[in-house]
Amino acid sequence: MNGILWHVKFVSPHSDWLVDRTGTLTVATTDPATSTVYLSDSLEGEFLLHVLIHELGHCILASYSLLDDIHRMVYPEYWIEMEEWICNFIANYGWQIFTDAYEILGYDALDILPYELERLIS
């Protein structure tokens, strides 16, 4: 993403890699310092896909320096909450956006959407 190679690693559900910035054990974390997404190896099916899309949202925010925008527009005490809200929005509604675009544009959506999204965030 934006020239950064991200890695995805599956780890034990009790791994220290799954402890987030607030000290909470979660099912996945993203470490921008190492460009790594850590996923619990107990995840599967639709929940795995949902969590992965959420974590890819964190990758996008870090890769395109969008966290700086959050930090500029939101009080510091809300930075983490806003970042999580954005990634939840992507995970919860991103698929719907692509599905609707595909229904409207057909196969052209597969060519047009990635280009337009890249243009919007670069």
Give the ranges of each region predicted by the language model:
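Metalloprotease/metallohydrolase-associated module, dominated by Zn2+-dependent proteases
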Residues: M1-F47, S63-S122
